[in-house]
Design a protein with these regions (language model features):
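Non-catalytic DNA-binding core/recognition domains of DNA-processing enzymes
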Residues: 1-12
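C-terminal accessory module of base-excision DNA glycosylases/AP lyases that mediates lesion recognition
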Residues: 11-131
Length: 131
């Protein structure tokens, strides 16, 4: 496992140093995310989507479908990510629901996560750095 992560970090550094435009968002967030996943071996859709969420929380039109989100969609193989086409079906559904409610998809996903954690505010995770 460590060799996969080391290889992923190496390729990330290499791409960052030589191909900066790869890391610039495009108008199609999902296509951009998928290109990043292809260019960064060992880093899948969920991890890349999470990084995009952290950098562009109100603009991103892709979301991190981690095991908790997948479980909400009825995914039972929680130790395995779905294939890209299934990932995009779930993601497109979430994007549609968020758009219908006028809430950025990353924000709605974070609200959903807070509910799973039985938290009223997203600040609970930051308590260790606030104190």
């Amino acid at each position: 496992m460590w060799s996969i992560k080391a290889n992923g970090i190496y390729h990330f550094q290499l791409e960052w140093a030589t191909n900066k435009q790869l890391f610039e968002p495009t108008n199609d967030w999902q296509t951009w995310r998928n290109k990043l996943v292809e260019a960064l071996p060992g880093i899948g859709q969920a991890k890349v989507s999470f990084a995009i969420e952290m950098i562009h929380p109100t603009e991103a039109e892709c979301i991190c479908l981690d095991r908790h989100m997948l479980k909400a969609f009825g995914w039972t193989q929680l130790d395995k990510q779905p294939e890209l086409d299934q990932y995009m079906i779930y993601e497109d559904y979430w994007l549609k629901l968020s758009a219908e409610r006028g809430v950025p998809p990353v924000i709605s996903r974070n609200i959903f996560w807070d509910r799973i954690q039985k938290q009223d505010s997203s600040l609970y995770w930051a308590q260790s750095i606030i104190d």
